[in-house]
Amino acid sequence: GKKFKVIGAVTQLGILGCDTNQWNDKVITKNPFFCPDKSMIKLWEKYLLNIRKSGSSCGAVIEVRARGIPTGLGAPIYSKLDMDIASAMMSINAVKGVNIGSGMNSAQLSGEQNSDEIFQKGKKLKFNSNNAGGILGGISSGQEIIASFAVKPTSSILTTRKTINKFG
């Protein structure tokens, strides 16, 4: 059968996001940040060093891409593929948000901007975009499935914070 591939990468470190249009699978495992955009690595090194020196921490966004996934996985109700992916991602400790495709950013788009137009090229169906993240109506569309999740900054930091104990 057709082979599929799943790959993940860190696409944002604190306030510094990378250009996911510059995604390069080969770069991901060749840097300590698992960043797919080579141009961000030095910036992230400096940024994280400053965060660490200040005694603080930062969050991150991890994007997962699945290629070669057959059309038709999932269901329109109850067993939606995007629901299952979001549930699995939310079960990871420290995850505070999940996006499928354009996710939260789709709220800023018009219907025309967000819709993934389909056209025929030869005998194959193609899409002009992938805002839906490869899932339409809970069912895989045959496009690359793209999902991301946000991880909160660790609360184990060196800076003084107000808290309470059993005495108040």
Each language-model region and where it sits:
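Glycine-rich, mobile lid/loop segments that gate access to catalytic sites or pores
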Residues: 1-77
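Catalytic/RNA-binding core of pseudouridine synthases
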Residues: 42, 167-168
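Glycine-rich anion/phosphate-binding loop at the beta-strand->alpha-helix junction
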Residues: 55-167
